[in-house]
Regions:
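Phosphate/dinucleotide-binding and metal-coordinating scaffold of catalytic cores
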Residues: 6-12, 163-649
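Short, solvent-exposed aromatic-acidic interface loops
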Residues: 146-147, 224-228, 435-439, 741-745, ...
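Extracellular and organelle-lumenal recognition/adhesion modules and their flexible linkers in secreted
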Residues: 6-164
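Extracellular beta-rich repeat passengers
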Residues: 93-95, 614-636, 641-643, 647-709, ...
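Short, surface-exposed charged micro-motifs
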Residues: 129, 221, 289, 419-421, ...
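Sec-dependent bacterial lipoprotein signal peptides
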Residues: 1-3
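Short strand-coil-strand connectors
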Residues: 105, 214-216, 293-295, 687, ...
Length: 972
């Protein structure tokens, strides 16, 4: 077992001093309608039956006409009291289950549980725990049969506790302070949300507060978080928290905290941990003790929000995170809950594609360009377009869905819960797993395909996985991950490797949740793995027989003029397409199910003045197909105004989106298929010769690409070389390979191979630019992504872009090579492990060597004439540098953002600063450099930031004040 302290004795005895009542009752004795027990009588004695029993001779029989069992009341239940109930049941039909209910008489608090805690033969133990959120006159506990079949209940056991203790405040406690006037505002939102039974957008406004840590106060903004009242119903309400300015909390700029019960206690943590080990993007997720305004709230689940820190922590380069806007869905759900007439609307079809961090994305030219491709890709995914390998990372999605299958999760696969990261290097979407609500009761082992079966039956295109299933490569990837994850050995190894983390979490949860069935939750994953194992054959059959499906087009009911329903997010959509000659082109689409007429607009300069259009733009009520119309309006236009026919002349304002409608972008552009002629037996071999390409060349659908010694490849007219398979270039000293751009426009030599091994020997890359067209922006003249690569006796010269050589997410060796005369950095490696030896880097306008999030050894290298840093390690890099010389740099060796550099036998000359250690990004900690070779110590100025450390021999220097690093740079 992964647990050491969550056994029965622990649960019942740990808080024995707080137990005020303990009841047990079987069906052995009754008097009239009462079951007679030692402590207290239970109702429903007339239903005593000798048909079956868990113990003894009798049980309580329930059916449709007599659905209750072992009913008992508790009076004067005070806020904070805990009632825990356990009841055994046996069903006449295995698919029918009993519930154990604990509730007040007014359904202010109604806790229902039908999850299995234990089984003994045909009997199942159900448990439920109720923690009073207010004072109650009466609380009832009972077994409930909500089916049409007979269900037998027996052996009820109930514990009532006066309270549960809170964890003690420690250095790791998240301590929040919200000023009184701000807390009052938050409380008003909480009250209104509870009244309406849904947390609408109006109740999610931010208030100001502080996080108190280590004697400092970090300013933050907070708001209520969640959609339904499960996030609000207890005193442990959910919050979204954003740190302000140049601050972070434990490496996080924004995050959420929520009651662990809303996230399945340990279940969701377990899935997040598997994702981390499988290199799948997911939010960082943990448990933390929380204090708000001096009151200990107890254990919360803390989950990272969708910031660039999420990506960098998982070894991804910053890129847009996108989603389908779900506001229309919640407006629809609110109407369905509160209005008498249930009329559906096209929430999915009308959903707009949005980035997280809208302002940052809009202001950054690079992020804006990347978003346009991300938007195009997500629109293709939304519309189930063919060839998904062109717009999503198929392997990542296969892994994502297999992990969700292991967790028996379908909630995260709903369209409105999906979040995608646009990888700016591969130009494809990757899924981000979060919000993993599990179905513990119905373990199937293949949730994906049951969900798809439902969609195929209805033939409605709302299950986005169908786009993936069309691709045979996805199906192969998916089956391989089912094979890996659907293994009991995999789960057992995971439990062993994470035993310490699991126990630490359980120790925190045990304070407030003494009856939490932790082992049941952990055993759940082993059961799910077994289910996956048992259904592998049916998966093979399903994939083999999978065929295309023709979808039924949804037809939506048009609103009668008398029906004043209006859902603003499922109505008029206005998008800024472009700006030219002082006028903006605005695209308009209508999804409101009534005729509308666009009448006017307003501008930033005259926000209170409506300017009438020369003629209105009219749309008929939406039923199945939208049409797009356009307006040309002044450059400072901000809103358009329209009148829905069914609202009696009411004028509605719609803000114009900063983002255009999705375009159909293929980043590869018009590419040549010339390499197909060189394909034989799964290998593409370019024979020795001279080649000139004027449009992109793409190598794919093969085992590997070989370029023979003596070949010469000229990339002109912005042509780029793109390979999605490993590359093998084995030039010789007498017959090297030349890859160059005679007109300096060639869009780089780019290799994307997630798992393969590439070899570059005796190859000269000269005069290349980087890929920068069709909104695809790379930084390297040579870009190598994923897998592993061995580079020997190569040169990277005269590049026309940011990096001479850029290696990303790869394991590499590079020896006897040269990087020279670069426009910016010489060699840039991100999220790599590697060894660089006996190489020369010279004449770089910026850093000679720049490593981020990497573990690198640098041995016997010569660096000269660097425009900024000779060697730079950042974002938690670990560098070992030995027998290396740096002659000419602003900073010889720099360690940034929690990086650790070990330096031995290094010669520094002509450097303005010998060493620098500093923190540049708030989510990281201080940096350090340790110089151990005393014979080669160099005296000179150093840059040392607050709490960063430089050790030279036995002398340790620690920064005492915060440096203005940007200012120091600007003064060079």
């Amino acid at each position: 077992s992964a647990l050491s302290s969550c056994n029965d004795g622990y649960k019942t005895n740990a808080h024995s001093d707080l137990i005020v009542q303990r009841l047990t009752c079987s069906a052995e004795e009754n008097k009239g309608d009462l079951f007679l027990c030692h402590e207290k009588s239970f109702v429903n004695g007339l239903q005593r039956s000798a048909d079956y029993s868990h113990t003894g001779n009798y049980s309580c029989k329930t059916n449709k006409s007599a659905p209750y069992a072992f009913t008992v009341e508790f009076r004067n239940v005070k806020k904070g009291e805990l009632i825990h109930a356990e009841i055994w049941f046996k069903s006449a039909k295995p698919s029918k289950v009993g519930n154990v209910i604990i509730s007040d008489n007014k359904t202010v608090q109604y806790d229902s549980n039908c999850f299995t805690a234990k089984t003994e033969g045909e009997w199942t133990l159900m448990t439920n725990t109720f923690k009073a959120i207010k004072d109650y006159d009466v609380v009832k506990v009972y077994g409930l049969n909500s089916t049409n079949s007979d269900i037998y209940f027996d052996d009820a056991s109930i514990v009532r506790m006066s309270s549960t203790p809170k964890p003690p405040v420690t250095d790791s406690t998240l301590r929040i302070y919200i000023p009184p006037h701000q807390f009052s505002l938050l409380d008003s939102f909480l009250t209104e949300g509870r009244k309406e039974m849904i947390l609408r957008k109006e109740f999610k406004k931010y208030v100001k507060g502080f996080i108190l840590q280590k004697g400092d106060s970090t300013p933050v903004k907070l708001r209520l978080k969640g959609d339904w009242t499960d996030h609000l119903k207890t005193d442990k309400y959910s919050l979204r928290i954003k740190t302000s300015g140049n601050n972070a909390y434990n490496g996080l700029k924004s995050f959420s905290i929520q009651n662990p019960e809303t996230r399945g206690m340990m279940l969701e943590w377990y899935i997040h941990q598997i994702c981390a080990e499988e290199d799948l993007l997911t939010t960082r997720y943990d448990f933390v003790n929380v204090e708000i305004n001096g009151e200990i709230k107890g254990a919360y689940a803390l989950e990272e929000h969708f910031d660039k820190q999420l990506l960098e922590a998982r070894n991804r380069r910053e890129g847009p995170i996108v989603k389908l806007d779900e506001e229309g869905l919640w407006q629809l759900n609110y109407d369905l809950e509160t209005k008498p007439r249930k009329v559906l609307s096209p929430a999915f079809m009308s959903s707009t594609i949005l980035p997280f961090k809208k302002n940052r994305t809009h202001k950054s030219a690079t992020l804006h360009e990347q978003f346009l491709v991300a938007q195009s890709n997500l629109n293709k995914y939304k519309n189930l377009e063919s060839d998904p390998n062109n717009y999503v990372n198929l392997e990542a999605f296969a892994k994502y869905i297999a992990i969700l299958d292991l967790g028996n999760v379908d909630h995260a696969q709903a369209w409105h819960n999906q979040r995608q990261y646009y990888n700016p290097v591969t130009a494809k979407l990757e899924p981000i797993l979060y919000d993993c609500f599990q179905d513990k009761q119905h373990i199937t082992g293949r949730r994906l395909f049951y969900l798809v079966d439902e969609v195929l039956t209805e033939r409605r295109p709302t299950n986005l996985n169908l786009a993936l299933l069309r691709d045979v490569n996805f199906r192969d990837f998916y089956l391989s991950y089912i094979q890996k994850l659907g293994s009991v050995d995999y789960i057992k190894n995971f439990n062993e490797n994470n035993a310490a983390k699991i126990q630490s979490n359980l120790d925190l949860l045990a304070y407030e949740y003494p009856f939490y069935q932790a082992q049941v939750d952990l055993d759940f994953f082993e059961k799910s793995a077994r289910a996956m194992e048992s259904e592998k054959d049916s998966l093979l059959t399903f994939m083999k027989d999978f065929k295309e499906v023709t979808f039924v087009k949804d037809v939506w009911q048009k609103f009668p003029d008398t029906l004043d329903y209006f859902r603003p997010a499922i109505a008029l959509k206005a998008h800024l397409e472009n700006e030219e000659g002082g006028m903006k082109k605005i695209s308009l689409r209508n999804f409101h199910q009534s005729d509308i007429s666009v009448k006017a607009y307003s501008t930033d300069s005259l926000p209170d003045q409506l300017i009438l259009l020369d003629s209105s733009v009219d749309f008929t009520g939406f039923t199945s197909d939208y049409e797009t119309k356009h307006l040309f309006l002044p450059s400072d236009v901000k809103y358009v105004y329209y009148v829905p026919k069914n609202l009696g002349g009411k004028l509605i304002r719609e803000k114009i989106s900063k983002w255009p409608l999705p375009d159909n972008i293929d980043v590869r552009g018009d590419f040549s298929s010339v390499l197909n002629q060189y394909k034989k037996k799964g290998i593409i071999t370019i024979p020795k010769g001279t080649y000139s390409f004027t449009k992109n060349v793409v190598a794919t659908d093969a085992e590997k690409l070989i370029i023979e010694a003596g070949s010469s490849i000229d990339l002109t007219n912005t042509a780029g070389f793109i390979s999605y398979i490993p590359v093998e270039i084995k030039g010789t000293p007498k017959n090297p390979v030349h890859i160059f751009s005679s007109d300096s426009t060639g869009s780089g030599f780019n290799v994307f191979s997630e798992h393969g091994h590439s070899i570059l020997e005796n190859t000269h890359f000269t005069g290349l630019n980087s890929m920068n067209k069709n909104h695809w922006i790379l930084t390297g003249a040579v870009t190598l992504y994923g897998g592993s690569v061995a580079i020997a006796n190569c040169s990277f010269n005269d590049n026309q872009c940011e990096d001479g050589l850029n290696i990303i997410r790869s394991k590499f060796t590079m020896t006897e090579s040269t990087v020279s005369n670069t426009l910016s950095d010489g060699f840039d490696a991100d999220f790599c492990t590697g060894v660089l030896s006996n190489s020369v880097i010279t004449l770089t306008k910026n850093d000679a060597l720049d490593f981020s999030g990497s573990q690198i050894e640098i041995i016997g290298c010569e660096i000269s004439k660097a425009g900024d840093k000779g060697i730079s390690g950042g974002e938690n890099s670990q560098l070992k540098i030995s027998n290396t010389s740096i002659n000419g740099a602003v900073i010889g060796i720099a360690s940034k953002d929690y990086s650790q550099l070990e330096v031995t036998d290094v010669r520094l000359k002509n450097c303005d600063y010998t060493y620098a250690a500093f923190r540049k990004k708030p989510e990281y900690g201080p940096a350090s450099i340790t110089v151990t070779s005393s014979s080669e110590q160099v005296k000179g100025r150093m840059l040392l930031d607050l709490d960063s450390k430089i050790t030279i021999g036995s002398k340790v220097s620690v920064g005492k004040e915060k440096l203005d690093i940007e200012s120091l740079y600007s003064n060079q």
